[in-house]
Amino acid sequence: MKFSESWLREWVNPAVTTDELTHQITMAGLEVDDVLPVAGTFNGVKVGHVVECGQHPDADKLRVTKVDVGEEELLDIVCGAANCRQGLKVAVATVGAVLPGDFKIKKAKLRGQPSHGMLCSFTELGIDVESDGIMELAIDAPIGMDFRDFLALNDVTVDVDLTSNRADCFSIRGMAREVGVLNRADVTEPSVAPVAPSIDDTVAIEVKAPAACPRYLGRVVKNVNVQAKTPLWMQEKLRRCGIRSIDPVVDITNFVLLEQGQPMHAFDLAKIDGGIVVRLAEQGEKITLLDGSEAELNADTLVVADHNKALAIAGIFGGEESGVTSETKDVLLECAFFAPDHIRGRARSYGLHTDSSMRFERGVDYALQVSAMERATALLVEICGGEVAPVVAVESEAELPKPNKVALRRTKLDNLLGHHIADSDVVEILERLGMTVETTAEGWVAVAPTWRFDIAIEQDLVEEVGRIYGYDNIPNQNPAAALKMHDHQEANIPLKRVRDLLVDRGYHEAITYSFVEPEQQKLVVPGVDALILPNPISAEMSAMRLGLIQGLLNTVVHNQKRQQPRVRLFEYGLRFIPCDTAENGMRQEPMLAGVIAGTRSEEHWNIDTNTVDFFDLKGDVEAILELSANDKAYSFVAAKHPALHPGQSAAIVVDGKEIGVIGTVHPELERKFGLNGRTIVFEIEWSAINRKVIPEAVALSKFPANRRDIAVVVDEAVASGDIVNACLEVGGEFLKAAKLFDVYVGKGVEEGKKSLAIALTLQSNERTLEDADIAGAVDAIVTHVSEKFGASLRD
């Protein structure tokens, strides 16, 4: 939003400098981006009157003039502008004047004729106006007046970067209100008296979309002189706000837009067939806009139409067929309130961005239309003449916005600002902002004014009080905080510890969606009905996940399609199990899952890049379980899972309870997911592994340990873990460890059998073991595994 400081001060004139004013505005939350002078630096330029104007005797394109600048003698000035003529009021740079660029005016002769000054154009005075020739001033411009004073050029343009919630400040009226509140200064608005109708001509108006257009005003003005010249004061105000002058009718609607904040539009009455209809467009309906472009409209776009065609995209852009031209005699002024929700996004969809759409999208004061119509009518009659008809208004009271009523608690205000502001100051600030305030036991209830769409919740009122009171006036205070030692159970295993462990082993953490494709999930977890979302993001994300494996497998596929030969991922997250007895009919259980695929290690010239297998992942899972410091509590038991290979899957058991699964993905599932090669996964209940046994210090034995190796032959179906556990069961007090170190199948071992080599470590804390002690323990172990598993010692 650009505005002229001098125009603002016509409304409110606080006793502050320009710098102080812009600082106030910025600190109030309306950030000032730039402050620029409205004209170049010059002096010695006066308002003059061309008394005589004749052709130069020796140059076809030059004219010899005599100009009155209020001095005793007329000035002889040679001018080359085509529009120079007798009777014109002009800007005259007298001898001694200094123009922008340090250009000094001196006495001179042009083709033999004396020239004691220069008739100036806008450009020569550093004024950004596109025009041909010299400036043409109003006929009543006072001769001899300093030109800077005449046009109030000791002024600046202030460019404010407004946030989307402050649509009320997209006008001089809005900025003046804000400055008045900040300085406790009265705002003087221009008097807008109703223009009495002089004719009875009206246009029928029908609003077919009242929710999108709750209020529509139309007024006919006949016999308008569109050839009239826009007054220089209006041109200047428009220019300083970044809008160029076009013609008096358009200039007036733009002026009201900038002054009042109300977008308006003018139609050529002769081009309207039947009457005005405000409706939604038909899908594919076309309209040629004022800039010559053609728009194909969507069915959700509001248009202003007559009985045969669309005349304008409502609140966004006018149509070429109904636009005002130099031939226009009669106009229809439009002034409406279009609901923001029905304008927002429409301009962008057609590649448009206008001053009108910018305001309507954010919200225009819905009580402004009547006064804006009267203001525009008065200016139109003053500048262009014309005969005025009555205003025709169509209004849907039920669809107009209702003022927001918001409660503000004293405690909330103090808590958020960290400072106590007196009750009287709070009430004064809110009332100066245009709110109606009622005091309650807990604080206040404020009714937002019609121009403040952004006042909706308690925090909005806190912000308003804080910024008007002044954040600089709130003293700095050190935060008051107490350091508290939080309880932490030593037995808990932090999730970060597990994350660090897996990252150290080459994994990357993944976060997958909790919403999954239901049919695909049935392949991974058949027989369990997932919770289906009533309003899913998409059909592919319509079920709550029953586990983490599905998301990880899809992530593996995603990476493999991007030429990643080695994938190692893990995820911590919730699974959602339907349960009638649980809160909201669903149990939310934290799970830890992982997946590996591709090569065992990164490609290296000195390392074989073998493909991963079941035991690679099993080792990583064992590392997680070993964090519990109780390696005797867990085991892997062969088990079937519908998503896993029947011969390469196991249940993870801790203290006799199944807490998870591990295995190679079933070949059929690999095919349906699109996996490339062998993929191994695991999934564990986090609550079953997040506690550890607190280790106890024990004395180390000072006596030597003894190792005995045995090789037992058992059926291939017997798990090696069961053999190891059987050894520990009967090994007695001297057996400290039993570990599998070799598995052999082949020559010398009967088909269907396998040889398991187990290292037995025996030691006493009290004495050196004798051969009889060791032999007794070994014999007991061999006898036990022989009886339990039919094992025999290998020769």
Swiss-Prot record:
Subcellular location: Cytoplasm
Cofactor: Mg(2+)
SMART domains in UniProt: B3_4, B5, FDX-ACB
Binding-site list for Mg(2+): D454, D460, E463, E464
Residue span, B5 domain: 401-476
UniProt cross-references to PROSITE patterns, sorted A to Z: B5, FDX_ACB, TRBD
GO molecular function, one term: tRNA binding
Principal subcellular localisation of the protein: cytoplasm
Keywords associated with the record: Aminoacyl-tRNA synthetase, ATP-binding, Cytoplasm, Ligase, Magnesium, Metal-binding, Nucleotide-binding, Protein biosynthesis, RNA-binding, tRNA-binding
Textual note on the cofactor: Binds 2 magnesium ions per tetramer.
Domain FDX-ACB: 701-794
Record-linked HAMAP family: Phe_tRNA_synth_beta1 (MF_00283)
PANTHER family cross-referenced by the UniProt entry: PHENYLALANINE--TRNA LIGASE BETA SUBUNIT, PHENYLALANYL-TRNA SYNTHETASE BETA CHAIN AND LEUCINE-RICH REPEAT-CONTAINING PROTEIN 47
Name by which UniProt lists this protein: Phenylalanine--tRNA ligase beta subunit
Record gene name: pheT
